[in-house]
Amino acid sequence: MSKTVLITGSSRGIGRSIALRFAKEKYNIVINCVNNHDLLEQLKDEITAMGADCIAFTGDVSNYDTVSRMFDIIKYKFGSVDVLINNAGISQIGLFQDLERKDWNRIIDTNIGSIYNCCHFAIPDMIKNKQGKIINISSVWGICGASCEVAYSASKGAVNALTQALAKELAPSSIQVNAVACGAIDTQMNSFLSKDEADALNEEIPAGRMGSADEVASLVFQIYKSPDYLTGQIIRFDGGWI
């Protein structure tokens, strides 16, 4: 029976590349986004054309009841989630003192609250099955912090701490929890950079360029395939930048 992989925030960018990478292996794929329904359906068509079965679920994974409905659909069609990839995330650029509380809540709820929600529903079956993989997409800003991205940095620091703590809790049940701390990746999240700003950033990165979404997807798949002894790790993927 094929394993089931859930990737949140997967209509574009890193999540999209991860979904396509797992689809190559003919896994059951569950893709999700908050409102880009058309993009999600296009991705579903690509995945099914590759021979993989797919559920496309449009909904806000920062909402607990929405995630509950998503897992009901998954359970009906595929059964339990074997691989949970928590990729949904948002950022906001600006001074901390100008950040409104509603925007703080939105960033925290999306970037860390969604992980609570999805883990809450995925973990019981993983424990029952004595196997499972949870991979959280984090950021180097969760390690060192970024000026003018305080809320995002705080949320990703929480992702890293959750990853390490949950890995210890679930290791006795043969469930591995790891995170990828991404550096500058060439996705829409960084599209606000001007050409001059992007060039200056590339000069700061020892590798001389931003990473690609496909490279992140390749690393995520390698983590999934890695020995079960690899758990609780925050793996930097930043071209030697930080």
Segments the model singles out, each with a brief description of its role:
Residues 119, 155:
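Active-site helix of classical SDR
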Residues 139:
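Residue(s) in the substrate-gating loop at a strand-loop-helix junction
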Residues 11-12:
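Conserved glycine-rich cofactor-binding loop
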Residues 95-96, 103-108, 197, 201:
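Substrate-binding pocket helix/loop in short-chain dehydrogenase/reductase
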Residues 124, 168-172:
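Alpha-helical segment proximal to the catalytic Tyr-Lys
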Residues 131, 209-237:
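C-terminal substrate-recognition "lid" of short-chain dehydrogenase/reductases
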Residues 171, 176, 230-232:
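Short, small/polar-rich loop/turn modules that mediate ligand/substrate recognition or access, typified
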